[in-house]
């Protein structure tokens, strides 16, 4: 009851003041997903990967950070230089346990470690009664304790997802059954096949009904989910979850007040090209942002769906090779709670892309967002286009795409055979809503080809030509400013368009206002969604060179 009252008080007070957006505090020494650990009330650390001699340390609860030498007792990581081991504190003993991302070979120093005397005490390899080292197989993520802390669960993958479980605090381990997602297949918008790596990188959370919920990365458009009723020993058949996300890592976190926080990339990759066979890693086109949502009812409904950060390098012409050719982007996360309302999280892969950030989760409850291009320069927009030649590790270089000119984003079509698509677009995120209103000031330039405006429940590339097939609502305005033969805009003149949708979960229609006046134009709901609308996507539909295009001057979203 006390937690409920605290939560209600917190939410009521939210309306009394503005909440700061998430902000960067440091760059972690390893890719996000492992190695971030609270040590005391004020101290938090981020450990490095194999070969690392320095760790990142905060002594003021995550606000400031410095690089310091690893403690002499800490056993060096043995797996990958770019990835730290997973380190967790045992809630029963207060000691720490460590797992490498992967155990391979016969390294005598390779195995599960536990501490005696705290994180800077003695680290020892775990051995069973026969003297064998504990080395759970597969690629592993962070452990959780379930069933009143009687069991440790580690999500792993290899040929599908499974869990390793231990009922003796990590001495011996058993493995669950394997759950799999279906292979991606060509068809529809896909001429080729995505990299079919199967169901991998699962995240786990114990629900209040004692079920364990698994959500995992797949090659499909959605993360897949599975449930266990016996604390991770057996798992149900995996099925699509409500969460969009393609070949990106999801992460659950239980807040101290009981709410569930979820970090993932609510993004869809570009359609697969004909040369994609599904047998190897592809060019990743949907890792430029990471999102957060929060649930107060054990995952039945979710609030937020907000971009936490857009990749600072997303428009770079040398995106795929700058500072080396490793994996890159903003997907992957790990979370530490700081206080009642704030969390610290790591996100991203690659030394110039990964970040440590602080978020006040009350920010997820906001119901409005605005962008004035003349003032903000479209810094919170995705506009880039892809140069369709794979470079580095699974990447495309980029061009900036639509640019800000005279206080507006100008969407053109510039012929360039190197691009995935010469048509320019722009996409912008706002808090999700089952019902809401998006208002935009736009101008069809004289001689331009018109404008497509789509409302979506996920991020699409600005230059994705297939958005109209997957958006929840689509408004197509031709070069003359007409919608289905009805004049609504005058080329060369700035207009204010508002799309008002109601009940997207039940496929409710949307209405249209122009310059503050209602029209009789109905915008049908193409696809219902249980997660609400959280994006507006603008696109130049030209079929030939368009040097005039259309302009977007501002946007405002308000949701319920």
List the model feature ranges, each with a label:
Residues 377-412, 422:
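Extracellular glycan-recognition surfaces and repeat-rich motifs
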Residues 440, 493-504, 510-512:
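Short tryptophan-centered beta-strand motifs in secreted/extracellular beta-sheet-rich domains
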């Amino acid at each position: 009851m006390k937690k409920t009252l605290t939560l209600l008080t917190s939410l009521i007070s939210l309306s009394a003041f503005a909440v700061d957006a998430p902000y960067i505090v440091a760059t972690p020494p390893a890719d996000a997903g492992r190695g971030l650990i609270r040590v005391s009330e004020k101290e938090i650390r981020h450990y490095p990967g194999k070969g690392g001699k320095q760790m990142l340390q905060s002594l003021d609860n995550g606000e400031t950070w410095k690089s310091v030498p690893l403690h002499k007792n800490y056993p060096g990581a043995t797996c990958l230089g770019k990835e730290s081991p997973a380190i967790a504190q045992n809630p029963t003993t207060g000691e720490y346990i460590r797992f490498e991302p992967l155990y391979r070979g016969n390294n005598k120093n390779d195995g599960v470690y536990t501490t005696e005397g705290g994180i800077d005490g003695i680290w020892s390899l775990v051995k069973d009664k026969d003297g064998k080292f504990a080395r759970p197989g597969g690629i592993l993520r962070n452990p959780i304790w379930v069933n009143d802390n009687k069991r440790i669960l580690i999500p792993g993958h290899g040929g599908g997802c499974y869990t390793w479980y231990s009922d003796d605090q990590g001495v011996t381990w058993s493995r669950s059954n394997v759950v799999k997602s279906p292979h991606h297949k060509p068809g529809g918008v896909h001429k080729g096949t995505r990299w079919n790596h199967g169901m991998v990188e699962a995240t786990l959370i114990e629900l209040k009904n004692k079920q364990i919920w698994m959500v995992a990365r797949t090659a499909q458009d959605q993360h897949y989910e599975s449930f266990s009723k016996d604390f991770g020993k057996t798992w149900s058949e995996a099925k699509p979850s409500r969460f969009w996300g393609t070949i990106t890592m999801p992460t659950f976190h239980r807040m101290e007040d009981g709410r569930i926080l979820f970090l993932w990339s609510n993004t869809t990759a570009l359609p697969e090209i004909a040369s994609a066979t599904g047998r190897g890693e592809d060019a990743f086109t949907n890792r430029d942002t990471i999102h957060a949502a929060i649930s107060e009812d054990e995952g039945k409904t979710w609030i937020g769906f907000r971009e936490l950060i857009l990749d600072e390098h997303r428009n770079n012409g040398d995106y795929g090779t700058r500072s080396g050719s490793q994996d890159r982007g903003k997907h992957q996360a790990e979370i530490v709670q700081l206080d009642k309302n704030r969390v610290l999280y790591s996100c991203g892969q690659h030394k110039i892309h990964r970040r440590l950030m602080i978020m006040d989760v009350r920010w997820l409850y906001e119901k409005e967002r605005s962008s004035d291009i003349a003032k903000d320069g479209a810094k919170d927009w995705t506009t880039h286009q892809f140069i369709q030649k794979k470079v580095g590790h699974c990447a495309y270089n980029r061009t900036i795409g639509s640019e800000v000119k005279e206080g507006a984003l100008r969407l053109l079509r510039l012929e360039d055979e190197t691009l995935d698509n010469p048509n320019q677009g722009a996409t912008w995120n706002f808090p999700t809503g089952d019902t809401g209103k998006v208002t935009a000031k736009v101008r069809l330039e004289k001689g331009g080809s018109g404008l497509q405006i789509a409302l979506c429940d996920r991020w699409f590339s600005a230059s994705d030509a297939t958005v109209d097939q997957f958006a929840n609502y689509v408004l197509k305005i031709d070069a003359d400013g007409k919608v289905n033969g009805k004049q609504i805009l005058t080329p060369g003149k700035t207009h204010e368009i508002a799309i008002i949708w109601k009940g997207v979960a039940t496929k409710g229609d949307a209405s249209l206002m122009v310059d503050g006046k209602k029209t009789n134009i109905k915008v049908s709901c193409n696809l219902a969604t249980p997660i609400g609308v959280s994006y507006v996507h603008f696109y130049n539909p030209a079929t030939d060179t368009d040097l005039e295009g259309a302009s977007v001057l501002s946007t405002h979203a308000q949701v319920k």
